[in-house]
């Protein structure tokens, strides 16, 4: 009887040890699954926004008695079109890739981390450049004797405002995506190591 009771106690203790680990794994799987769903939608939403901003700017031209103006006349607006096109393509590709289950490795995590950062800065710089040009078109510049162009080309400026505003909304989405890709990389994988031949050992590249 004592031997049997000892076996039962041992099995119970094993279950107690295994139980929390199993529940932790289930919880981590639940978090990863929900995070993948959220990330997929965050990558899908910018597609429509980028395409909308791109189309608005592409069709933006005006001609009246004062002359004619088109988005192609200004480099900042051309940059905005290209940036939104790149953003739409990358968002679609990355959303499809993220939605696929069990495709995760340190190389993939690093790739998404870097690309998300790059896209964030590309979209941000495109929006900032367009906003600066729009400000000059709206307010003019007394120091250089530039008058307000938007007084003569109001509809053109309104479309620029709409396209630029949508672009900044896309920036918000990509800031969130950058945070998610950073979390997925640095919470799951160790810091990269750099070989040091003189010491004959590997050194962690990040110092905490």
Swiss-Prot record:
Record keywords, A-Z: Cell membrane, Membrane, Transmembrane, Transmembrane helix
**Record's keyword annotation contains Cell cycle:** no
Q: Name one GO cellular component term.
A: plasma membrane
Q: How does it sit in the membrane?
A: Multi-pass membrane protein
Name the InterPro entries for this protein. Answer: CASP/CASPL, CASP_dom
- Transmembrane parts of this sequence: 37-57, 80-100, 108-128, 160-180
- Looking at the record's lineage, which domain of life comes first? Eukaryota
Q: Which residues form a coiled coil?
A: none
Q: Which residues lie on this side of the membrane: Extracellular?
A: 58-79, 129-159
* Pfam families associated with the record: CASP_dom
The question of whether Transmembrane is a record keyword is answered with yes
Q: Per the annotation, which location comes first and is thus the protein's main one? A: membrane
The compartments listed are:
Cell membrane
Q: Which residues lie on this side of the membrane: Cytoplasmic?
A: 1-36, 101-107, 181-208
Tell me the protein family, please: Belongs to the Casparian strip membrane proteins (CASP) family.
Q: How does it assemble?
A: Homodimer and heterodimers.
Q: What is this protein called?
A: CASP-like protein 2A1
């Amino acid at each position: 009887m004592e031997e049997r009771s000892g076996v039962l106690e041992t099995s119970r203790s094993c279950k107690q040890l295994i139980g929390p680990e199993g529940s932790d794994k289930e919880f981590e799987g639940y978090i990863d699954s929900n995070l993948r769903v959220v990330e997929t939608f965050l990558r899908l939403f910018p597609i429509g926004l980028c395409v909308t901003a791109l189309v608005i700017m592409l069709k933006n031209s005006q001609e009246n008695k004062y002359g004619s103006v088109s988005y192609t006349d200004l480099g900042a607006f051309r940059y905005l079109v290209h940036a939104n096109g790149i953003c739409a393509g990358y968002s679609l590709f990355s959303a499809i890739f993220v939605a696929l289950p069990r495709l995760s490795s340190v190389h993939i995590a690093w790739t998404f981390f870097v690309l998300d950062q790059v896209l964030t800065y590309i979209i941000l710089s495109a929006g900032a450049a367009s906003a600066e040009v729009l400000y000059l078109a709206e307010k003019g510049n007394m120091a250089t004797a530039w008058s307000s162009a938007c007084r003569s080309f109001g509809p053109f400026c309104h479309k620029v405002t709409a396209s630029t505003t949508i672009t900044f909304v896309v920036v918000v989405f990509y800031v969130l995506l950058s945070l998610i890709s950073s979390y997925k990389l640095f919470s799951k994988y160790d810091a990269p190591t750099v070989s040091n031949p003189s010491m004959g050992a590997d050194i962690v590249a990040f110092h905490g």
